[in-house]
Amino acid sequence: MTENKTVLREASNVVTIEGTLAEVRHTEWKNGNGLNIELDIEVAPNEVHTVKGFSKYKKDDGTDNAVAKGYQTIVSEYKSIAKHGRDEADKVRITQGKISLNEYYSHGIFKSYPQLMANFVNRLDANEEFNPRAEFDVEVFVKNVTEEKVKGEETGRVNLNGYIPVYNGKVIPFTFVVTKEGSQYVENNYEKGTTVNVFGKIINYKEQKVTTKVAAFGEDKKEITSITRREYLITGGNDPYDEDSKNAFNADAIKKALTEREIYLDELKKEGNKENNKKSGFGGSAPNNKPSKPVEISDDDLPF
């Protein structure tokens, strides 16, 4: 049996972002051993992407961590719109970002949101070509393809639902939307259990429109409408990998990773309950001392 049948390799998962640095936020770890960073990068009017990162200051061997040093340089030297104004703000480029998930429990309710991670962010020189964009190129193990519906109406686009293998044999579920032009191909060719390589645009558009309602007497009324569009839009992709290809993800390895993910989520829920109990100064819920149920995954949740 070849290695790819027993070990779940990390998927190719590349995010490219180029834009103007809008804002930098960072926090030091409580133990003083590292930091978290968040960057807002503007790629178009009304379109800003938040990229996150975290790093220890030192590697295990005691030497300086280049990732943390890079973050410190961003905090101390990079110029943002928020602090220095649009004319002075740096143009930045990320070429090795990754799609990830921010997952947690809040008051017993599971929350899961897409997030973008990056270790290195480069400043562009004044003479470098500037091409603002936010794009992804990623391998996915297909769970299914479904019709996209908005308010119960089909849009003519489809959703590609699948799993992205990440580090240490883990997987994350992820949903992409496909352009109308590509939806029929995806629906006809991206079958359950296949491995595919797709690429496209990351869209995070938010605009507020102000309209005035003219009054017959008194003051006119201003009405604010928010327009928001967040999606990972597939604009192209390759034929599914042959099932015997060394690059095709193995269904049994995916199933094992999904079982381990359920265990992880159960532990995440317990941690969330602990935090909520700590915050309950009075009348908090009693601790749940019941033994955990065995992890069971429905056949409907499996991509094979």
From Swiss-Prot:
Region of interest called Disordered, as start-end residue ranges on this chain: 268-304
Comp. bias intervals (Basic and acidic residues): 268-278
Protein name: SPbeta prophage-derived uncharacterized protein YorF
Gene: yorF
